C-alpha cells in the first residue's frame, strides 16, 4: 500500500480478502462501503460533533470514516481525531492502529480500547452532550438496541444524528429491527437496505439506516419559549427544518 493514501490502504486490505484462502476477514467492502460513503456524504459532521464507530476489527471502516469525516467535526483539520472507534480485542487494536497510521489518518481517526458499554460514558465525559453526529455499529447485533439506548439515555446523540448498523441480518440484530424499524415506531427516515457481502454475491445481508429525531419537550414543561432564553430564541431567524435528512 502507498503510505499516506487511504484508498491504497483500503485496496490492500480488500486484496487480502480476495485471496480465496483468507476469506475469514470480514469487512464492510463493496456495496456496503458505497452505503457508508453515501451516508457520510449526506450527513456531514457539524463543528461540535464527532463520529463514532462501535467495533473496529482491523480498521477498514475506521479508515473510511476518518477519510470521509475526519476533516470535519469538533476539531476540523486539527491534530485531534474527528472519528473515534472502540475495539475490545488487543490484537485487533494494534492492527487497526497500524493500518490507520499507514493511511496517515491518525489525526482523523482514533481507536479506543475497551468494552463498548463501559466506554460509551467516556464520550460524554470528554465531548459533552449531543456530540455524536454519526454512529456506525458493527460489533454485536444482539447489543445494538442496548447500546443505542445507552447513547440516548446519556444524551449523546445530536439532533438528526445518523445511525448506520451493519450485519443486521447475519449474524442479525432482531431486537434492534423490531424496536426501531417497524411501524409505527420507526421514524420516516428509517430504512433497511438489502445488500450482498463483500466478494460473496450469493450471501445476503442487511444494513439499517436511520436519523435520530430531536428529543421532544414534555407537554407543559418549560421550553425555549419561556424566560430570557425564549426571548433570545424568538429574536433569531426561523428554522427551516433539519439540516440533514436521509
Model-predicted regions and their roles:
Residues 1-28, 42:
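Rossmann-like AdoMet
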Residues 6, 10, 33-36, 62, ...:
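A general structural signal for well-ordered alpha-helical segments in protein cores
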Residues 23-121:
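SAM cofactor-binding core of SAM-dependent methyltransferases
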Residues 43, 101-104, 127-130, 181-183:
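Short, hinge-like loop/turn segments at secondary-structure boundaries
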Residues 56, 108-173:
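Active-site segment flanking the S-adenosylmethionine/decSAM binding pocket
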Residues 143-246:
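C-terminal substrate-binding/active-site "lid" region of AdoMet-derived donor-dependent transferases
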Amino acid at each position: 500500500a502507498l503510505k499516506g493514501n487511504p484508498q491504497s490502504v483500503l485496496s490492500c486490505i480488500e486484496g487480502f480478502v480476495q485471496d480465496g484462502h483468507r476469506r475469514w476477514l470480514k469487512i464492510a467492502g463493496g456495496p456496503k462501503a458505497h452505503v457508508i460513503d453515501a451516508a457520510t456524504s449526506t450527513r456531514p459532521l457539524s463543528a461540535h460533533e464527532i463520529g463514532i464507530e462501535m467495533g473496529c476489527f482491523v480498521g477498514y471502516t475506521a479508515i473510511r470514516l476518518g477519510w470521509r469525516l475526519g476533516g470535519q467535526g469538533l476539531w476540523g483539520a486539527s491534530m485531534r481525531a474527528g472519528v473515534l472507534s472502540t475495539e475490545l480485542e488487543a490484537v485487533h487494536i494494534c492492527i487497526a492502529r497500524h493500518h490507520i497510521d499507514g493511511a496517515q489518518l491518525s489525526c482523523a481517526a482514533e481507536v479506543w480500547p475497551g468494552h463498548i458499554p463501559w466506554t460509551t460514558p467516556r464520550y460524554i465525559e470528554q465531548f459533552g452532550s449531543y456530540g455524536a453526529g454519526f454512529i456506525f455499529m458493527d460489533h454485536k447485533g444482539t447489543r445494538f438496541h442496548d447500546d443505542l439506548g445507552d447513547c440516548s439515555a446519556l444524551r449523546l446523540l445530536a439532533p438528526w444524528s445518523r445511525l448506520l448498523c451493519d450485519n443486521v441480518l447475519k449474524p442479525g440484530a432482531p431486537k434492534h429491527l423490531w424496536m426501531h424499524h417497524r411501524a409505527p415506531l420507526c421514524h420516516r427516515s428509517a430504512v433497511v437496505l438489502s445488500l450482498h457481502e463483500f466478494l460473496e454475491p450469493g450471501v445476503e445481508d442487511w444494513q439499517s439506516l436511520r436519523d435520530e429525531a430531536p428529543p421532544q419537550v414534555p407537554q407543559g414543561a418549560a421550553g425555549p419559549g419561556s424566560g430570557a432564553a425564549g426571548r433570545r430564541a424568538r429574536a433569531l431567524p426561523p428554522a427551516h427544518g433539519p439540516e440533514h435528512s436521509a
